[in-house]
């Protein structure tokens, strides 16, 4: 009850009494994952990360979880239908009543259209799609220093967010790893694929007057401040 009151007061105090539903778009290393956590806490909305959702369904040991695990372990991509079904289940959950924050979804124009239909069927109005823009040189520096704890999905950075003990997860003490594709040449290929897939998604949201661009070259706190200002402005326009 105390948590609910604090959440209600925060939303009332800052004039955000309505639902806030957002999509975050950005390449790996753009900082959207870091900002997603801050946004979800700030507005008390449901953070839907496809990576977290897929890890959870695998951990459940269900028939679907075993199917997803086989796909991911073989290096395949989980189908749009499976991802959208899992997203739909989360959308309907009570903890998402204040709004939704989509992180890592949609990744293709087909997913964007499916998400649009999912929200429309539930009479949910997407407030905005936030695109994280940053210089390629900064992106390379961020990506190539990343460290991961595979079991939990926690991430660190050798320069910007190092673990307490080098190459060791702060919580479990497990060994951290570099992703094999977090190297300059592999990164170029990933960004080429990202740009190819994201262009129609950006056009899709821009045609709906929902696309807002974020200068992700700035530090974490300034980026978060800019996001809050954009959300305030967009909410005012929607009234």
From Swiss-Prot:
<feature type="binding site">
    <location>
        <position position="179"/>
    </location>
    <ligand>
        <name>AMP</name>
    </ligand>
</feature>
<feature type="region of interest" description="LID">
    <location>
        <begin position="145"/>
        <end position="182"/>
    </location>
</feature>
<comment type="function">
    <text>Catalyzes the reversible transfer of the terminal phosphate group between ATP and AMP. Plays an important role in cellular energy homeostasis and in adenine nucleotide metabolism.</text>
</comment>
<dbReference type="InterPro" id="IPR000850">
    <property type="entry name" value="Adenylat/UMP-CMP_kin"/>
</dbReference>
<keyword id="KW-0545">Nucleotide biosynthesis</keyword>
<dbReference type="GO" id="GO:0005524">
    <property type="term" value="F:ATP binding"/>
</dbReference>
<feature type="binding site">
    <location>
        <position position="111"/>
    </location>
    <ligand>
        <name>AMP</name>
    </ligand>
</feature>
<dbReference type="InterPro" id="IPR033690">
    <property type="entry name" value="Adenylat_kinase_CS"/>
</dbReference>
<keyword id="KW-0808">Transferase</keyword>
<dbReference type="GO" id="GO:0004017">
    <property type="term" value="F:adenylate kinase activity"/>
</dbReference>
<feature type="binding site">
    <location>
        <begin position="76"/>
        <end position="78"/>
    </location>
    <ligand>
        <name>AMP</name>
    </ligand>
</feature>
<dbReference type="GO" id="GO:0005737">
    <property type="term" value="C:cytoplasm"/>
</dbReference>
<dbReference type="InterPro" id="IPR027417">
    <property type="entry name" value="P-loop_NTPase"/>
</dbReference>
<dbReference type="Pfam" id="PF05191">
    <property type="entry name" value="ADK_lid"/>
</dbReference>
<keyword id="KW-0963">Cytoplasm</keyword>
<dbReference type="Pfam" id="PF00406">
    <property type="entry name" value="ADK"/>
</dbReference>
<dbReference type="InterPro" id="IPR007862">
    <property type="entry name" value="Adenylate_kinase_lid-dom"/>
</dbReference>
<keyword id="KW-0547">Nucleotide-binding</keyword>
<dbReference type="GO" id="GO:0006756">
    <property type="term" value="P:AMP phosphorylation"/>
</dbReference>
<keyword id="KW-0067">ATP-binding</keyword>
<dbReference type="GO" id="GO:0006166">
    <property type="term" value="P:purine ribonucleoside salvage"/>
</dbReference>
<dbReference type="GO" id="GO:0046083">
    <property type="term" value="P:adenine metabolic process"/>
</dbReference>
<feature type="binding site">
    <location>
        <position position="190"/>
    </location>
    <ligand>
        <name>AMP</name>
    </ligand>
</feature>
<feature type="binding site">
    <location>
        <position position="146"/>
    </location>
    <ligand>
        <name>ATP</name>
    </ligand>
</feature>
<dbReference type="GO" id="GO:0006172">
    <property type="term" value="P:ADP biosynthetic process"/>
</dbReference>
<feature type="region of interest" description="NMP">
    <location>
        <begin position="49"/>
        <end position="78"/>
    </location>
</feature>
<dbReference type="InterPro" id="IPR006259">
    <property type="entry name" value="Adenyl_kin_sub"/>
</dbReference>
<dbReference type="GO" id="GO:0016208">
    <property type="term" value="F:AMP binding"/>
</dbReference>
<comment type="subunit">
    <text>Monomer.</text>
</comment>
<protein>
    <recommendedName>
        <fullName>Adenylate kinase 2</fullName>
        <ecNumber>2.7.4.3</ecNumber>
    </recommendedName>
</protein>
<keyword id="KW-0418">Kinase</keyword>
<feature type="binding site">
    <location>
        <begin position="104"/>
        <end position="107"/>
    </location>
    <ligand>
        <name>AMP</name>
    </ligand>
</feature>
<comment type="pathway">
    <text>Purine metabolism; purine nucleotide biosynthesis.</text>
</comment>
<feature type="binding site">
    <location>
        <position position="55"/>
    </location>
    <ligand>
        <name>AMP</name>
    </ligand>
</feature>
<feature type="binding site">
    <location>
        <begin position="155"/>
        <end position="156"/>
    </location>
    <ligand>
        <name>ATP</name>
    </ligand>
</feature>
<comment type="similarity">
    <text>Belongs to the adenylate kinase family. AK2 subfamily.</text>
</comment>
<feature type="binding site">
    <location>
        <position position="50"/>
    </location>
    <ligand>
        <name>AMP</name>
    </ligand>
</feature>
<dbReference type="GO" id="GO:0005829">
    <property type="term" value="C:cytosol"/>
</dbReference>
<keyword id="KW-0660">Purine salvage</keyword>
<feature type="binding site">
    <location>
        <begin position="29"/>
        <end position="34"/>
    </location>
    <ligand>
        <name>ATP</name>
    </ligand>
</feature>
């Amino acid at each position: 009850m105390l948590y609910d009151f604090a959440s209600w007061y925060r939303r009332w105090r800052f004039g955000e009494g309505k639902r806030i539903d957002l999509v975050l778009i950005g390449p790996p290393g753009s900082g959207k994952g870091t900002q997603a956590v801050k946004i979800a806490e700030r507005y008390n909305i449901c953070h839907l990360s496809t990576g977290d959702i897929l890890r959870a369904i695998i951990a459940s040991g269900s028939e679907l979880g075993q199917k997803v695990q086989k796909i991911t372990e073989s290096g395949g991509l989980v189908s749009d239908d499976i991802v959208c079904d899992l997203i739909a289940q989360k959308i309907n959950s009570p903890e998402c009543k204040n709004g939704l924050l989509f992180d890592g979804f949609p990744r293709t124009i087909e997913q964007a259209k499916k998400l649009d239909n999912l929200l429309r069927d539930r009479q949910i109005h997407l407030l905005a799609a936030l695109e994280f823009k940053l210089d390629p040189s900064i992106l390379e520096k961020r990506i190539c220093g990343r460290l991961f704890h595979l079991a939990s999905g926690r991430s660190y950075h050798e320069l910007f967010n190092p673990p307490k003990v080098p190459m060791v997860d702060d919580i479990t003490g497990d060994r951290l790893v570099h992703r094999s594709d977090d190297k300059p040449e592999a990164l170029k290929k990933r960004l080429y694929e990202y740009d190819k897939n994201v262009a129609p998604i950006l056009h899709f949201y821009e045609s709906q007057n929902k696309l807002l661009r974020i200068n992700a070259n700035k530090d974490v706190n300034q980026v978060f401040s800019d996001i809050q200002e954009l959300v305030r402005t967009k909410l005012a326009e929607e009234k």
